[in-house]
Regions:
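Non-globular, low-confidence helical/coil segments that flank catalytic cores
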Residues: 1-166
Length: 166
């Protein structure tokens, strides 16, 4: 229904895919996944839009709900490389690629997850994996709204502000 309402209102609605890019204020954004056409274009979690932002002193990648297989495929066709911030895939489920996160080598890993969810997210294995690659886990269930910004001192350092502290 939303799609129909948007198009009726004159909005152009299309599926995002690798190669789409633009700017938003001082940020450059690039769609890394899914790949248009071919076998890499999928639906559901494996087809989650993955977007990279770069600007204002921070490089980040948002992984949607990509599971391990899709993360490996993304790495093969459009490796993001090192980033400052990663929005951890699929609420921190166990379906993650340790090698992919090691290659990201993010300073901060944002985990969007509901408190007391029945899925056990984020999983202990995901949290251990982030710890092992030096990524600070910042969780919405425990810390609430979180903001990451370049530190005033510069030098690539980041400042993390959380609604609930911790």
């Amino acid at each position: 229904r939303l799609h129909a309402r948007l198009t009726e209102g004159g909005a152009e609605v299309r599926q995002a895919a690798k190669g789409d890019a633009g700017t938003l204020g001082g940020l450059r954004w690039d769609i890394l996944w899914p790949v248009p056409g071919g076998s890499e274009m999928q639906t559901g979690n494996p087809g989650s839009v993955t977007i990279e932002f770069d600007g204002r002193g921070i490089r980040s990648v948002f992984l949607g709900d990509l599971g391990e297989d899709a993360q490996v495929a993304l790495d093969r066709v459009s490796a993001p490389g090192r980033v400052d911030v990663v929005k951890v895939a699929h609420h921190g489920s166990r379906d993650q690629s340790p090698q992919f996160y090691a290659e990201l080598h993010a300073t901060v890993g944002l985990i969007s997850v509901g408190a007391d969810n029945g899925y056990g997210h984020p999983t202990a294995s995901l949290l251990d994996m982030l710890r092992s690659v030096g990524t600070l886990a910042v969780r919405t269930d425990r810390q609430g709204l979180s903001v990451v910004a370049p530190a005033a001192a510069g030098g690539g350092a980041l400042t993390v502000w959380t609604e609930k502290g911790g």
